[in-house]
């Protein structure tokens, strides 16, 4: 069963508390000019930011967002005349300075029927340096009657000066068991099956909720099998890099990152204390270095680098570290 895309932040029970906090803050006075919504991937950043915009524009302040007024109808269709989304331009992975300048021009105009205006920057970490500097000036002197919302899963990639001008809302993630229960109720399947998927994909419920359980389990098994074969020397890094260089590139790296992280956490546990001996520390250090490489490659994927070459270098280093450390992820983890 595929429940389809998430339509509202109210479908995510772990967001009810931050939503209540926002309502309480708005009831206590004037809303801030700028908000920074942060949280780990899978927490529901975009739907929460959309909820903020709907709340801001709704004409029924007692029930906002009411879902039935003209503003809510516009927002639901993605066509509100006083809301301006700011996203990377087509065929680009950046938000550019000319887009920010155009946004400033739009916000300087009178709103439709004198209404308030808003902008949503998502994903905000895609602002390039010039665009971020231009946006900072807007934050320092925000247009009257406007709300600026930035949403990002990588706030450290925004300039500190931009972050400091915003009120930050950090969204929580549910416990893995809660995520699995939610996925089971929404998408079908058992919580145990979804926990197996999340053990590799990471605790990112909204990222996998549109997947069929069977497909998610198959992809999880394939990634574990690839990691096992790489560690055993049964797969060549060059050939595996060619296979991984597809539309699942990022999810594969996320899965590899989680497998390594899980291994390192288990190695630090009391069940395998021998791995913490002085003689074995270089092996663990090599695993941490591979983990850093995986995270760096995920960031580089958003730049015009040779992705296939980067994957080959990463998987070659991973194979050497896996063999040295005796890395052997279990298919039934």
Model-derived segments and spans:
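Structural recognition of the conserved hydrophobic beta-strand(s) that form the central parallel beta-sheet
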Residues: 119-123, 135, 146-152
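Charged, glycine-rich active-site and insertion segments that engage polyanionic ligands
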Residues: 1-55, 63, 71-74, 144-146, ...
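AAA+/P-loop NTPase substrate/partner-engagement loops
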Residues: 62-95, 156
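ATP/adenylate-binding site constellation spanning eukaryotic-like Ser/Thr protein kinases
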Residues: 80, 100, 132, 163, ...
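Conserved alpha-helical scaffold flanking the Walker A/P-loop in AAA+ ATPase domains
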Residues: 21-26, 94-118, 125-126, 130-138
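Short loop/turn elements that form and flank the Walker-type P-loop nucleotide-binding site
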Residues: 30-31, 76-80, 112-115, 142-145
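Localized chelating/binding microdomains
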Residues: 86-91, 108, 117, 170-174, ...
